[in-house]
UniProtKB/Swiss-Prot annotation:
Any further remark recorded for this protein: This germline gene belongs to a set of closely related genes that could encode V regions of NPb antibodies.
Name assigned to this protein: Ig heavy chain V region 3
Ranges for region Complementarity-determining-2: 69-85
Originating species: Mus musculus (Mouse)
Gene: Ighv1-61
UniProt record, GO biological process: adaptive immune response
Length: 117
């Protein structure tokens, strides 16, 4: 049986009037089908606990799909029902970093993933 892989591209976007607001993600992940991956999004230039962090998926040639969001102050989450069993959103307030864990990966999970404030 041949080796197969899933490629996840990670992109960060930030909104707001302050140009120093930054969201930093690793460039790409290469993972095996059936495995899980934890994507990170490190925030700087604003009060991390005061803004919702959203996660969005875009497959090649397709539109954006909202996965869910998390409020870092109390870790309240909302999920698109489609991703309820796929994605788990968490934060580490001490490092101002948001995380999204994707489980049971398949070829359908090969996409660009955005974190956005």
């Amino acid at each position: 049986m041949g080796w197969s892989c899933i490629i996840l591209f990670l992109v960060a976007t930030a909104t707001g009037v302050h140009s120093q607001v930054q969201l930093q993600q690793p460039g790409a992940e290469l993972v095996r089908p059936g495995s899980s991956v934890k994507l990170s999004c490190k925030a700087s230039g604003y009060t991390f606990t005061s803004y919702w962090m959203d996660w969005v998926k875009q497959r090649p040639g397709q539109g954006l799909e909202w996965i869910g969001n998390i409020y870092p102050s109390d870790s309240e989450t909302h999920y698109n029902q489609k991703f309820k069993d796929k994605a788990t959103l968490t934060v580490d307030k001490s490092s101002s970093t948001a995380y999204m864990q994707l489980s049971s990966l398949t070829s359908e999970d090969s996409a660009v993933y955005y974190c956005a404030r």
